[in-house]
Curated annotation (Swiss-Prot):
GO cellular component, one term: cytosol
Catalysed reactions listed for this entry: 2 D-alanine + ATP = D-alanyl-D-alanine + ADP + phosphate + H(+)
Location of the ATP-grasp domain: 116-311
Protein name: D-alanine--D-alanine ligase
Pfam family, one: Dala_Dala_lig_C
Function according to Swiss-Prot or TrEMBL: Cell wall formation.
The family this protein is said to belong to: Belongs to the D-alanine--D-alanine ligase family.
Keyword Magnesium (UniProt): yes
GO BP annotations, alphabetical order: cell wall organization; peptidoglycan biosynthetic process; regulation of cell shape
Protein source organism: Pseudomonas entomophila (strain L48)
UniProt-annotated binding residues for Mg(2+) 1: 265, 278
N-terminal signal peptide: none
Protein localization: Cytoplasm
Gene: ddl
Cross-referenced Gene3D superfamilies: 3.40.50.20, ATP-grasp fold, A domain, ATP-grasp fold, B domain
Length: 318
């Protein structure tokens, strides 16, 4: 029996990938998550027979890429230096094909403000927001947006530096904390309602996942540590709303230029409307991660998932 997801599978012989550098670790605030993701990807590719070179990205990266005679790179770096277009630019200069989105889409997706501006320009729903650079900005945002609000560093992932606030005093404190991670800080309207995450792979939207957590929101602990986070596949939406969510995901990813794979985070408000939060171009691949869960629901085990991501780099970049 055929499935709508059958075309996601890699049909390539592993020799077609050549010598593959798995780029992980790095120096961003998400290093620990990337180390776990990288270890899982390395194990899966190695067991599939791929010629893998594991590279914990540091100051010797350029020399290692050249000395190891790398044919292709699997980017599983999270955050700055790996997910923001800079690594993609380096690999383009070296002529090394790589997984995932290109330079522009990676840079856009890593910048929450620019992502929102692109979506807004196309009429794609995303929560109202303001940029915080001073206590005066906090006062103005409080008056304009009301409470509750959520504060976010504009260029961090894994919910690092994020906080929900219910007063102007809390907003000022959260802005100061977020500013330790990023010179640009966003504050958004808090959306009351369920949260969904939707993975995309090789141009296809995978089954949406509904998230539930006893935490205030789906924070770092809920994502990577806690065992009380709830994941629901099927997501519980009726067929019409689920298709609306899938179509919105495809449109939002196309607007940013997402390639290969990624993951979109979405809220649904009390009126049933969807609001896009952000998109990740190199999502987590740990034992708590969401893309592997969505892939399983689409009929791909973890090894098949990483081979599909790698195969897409052959299709798009040779």
């Amino acid at each position: 029996m055929t499935s709508a997801y059958d075309k996601l599978h890699s049909t390539l012989d592993v020799k077609a990938f050549g010598r593959v550098a798995v780029l992980y670790g790095g120096k961003s605030a998400e290093r620990e998550v990337s180390l776990k993701s990288g270890a899982a990807v390395i194990e899966a590719l190695t067991s599939a027979g791929v010629d893998v070179v594991a590279i914990d990205v540091g100051d010797d990266l350029l020399a290692r890429l050249q000395n190891e005679k790398i044919d292709r790179a699997f980017i599983i770096l999270h955050g700055r230096g790996g997910e923001d277009g800079s690594m993609q630019g380096l690999l383009e200069c070296l002529g090394i094909p790589y997984t995932g989105s290109g330079i522009l889409a990676s840079a856009l997706a890593m910048d929450k403000l620019r992502t929102k501006q692109v979506w807004q320009s196309l009429g794609i729903p995303t929560p109202r927001h303001a940029v915080l650079a001073s206590e005066q900005d906090c006062v103005a945002a409080s008056a304009e947006l009301g409470f509750p609000l959520i504060v976010k560093p504009a260029h961090e992932g894994s919910s690092i530096g994020m906080a929900k606030v219910n007063s102007e005093q809390e907003l000022v404190a959260a802005w100061k904390d977020a500013a330790k991670y990023d010179s640009q800080v966003l504050v958004e309207q808090w959306i009351h309602g369920p949260e969904f995450t939707i993975a995309v792979l090789r141009g296809q939207v995978l089954p949406p996942i509904a998230l539930g957590t006893p935490h205030v929101f789906y924070d770092y602990d809920a994502k990577y540590i806690a065992n009380d986070t709830q994941y629901r596949i099927p997501c519980g939406l009726d067929s019409v709303k689920e298709q609306e969510l899938i179509d919105l995901t495809a449109r939002a990813c196309d607007a940013i230029g997402i390639e290969g794979w990624g993951r979109l985070d979405v809220m649904q408000d009390e009126q049933g409307r969807f609001w896009l939060l952000e998109v990740n171009t190199a999502p987590g691949m740990t034992d708590h991660s969401l893309v592997p869960m969505a892939a399983r629901a689409a009929g791909l085990d973890f090894q098949q998932l990483v081979l599909a991501i790698l195969a897409d780099s052959v299709a798009t970049r040779g």
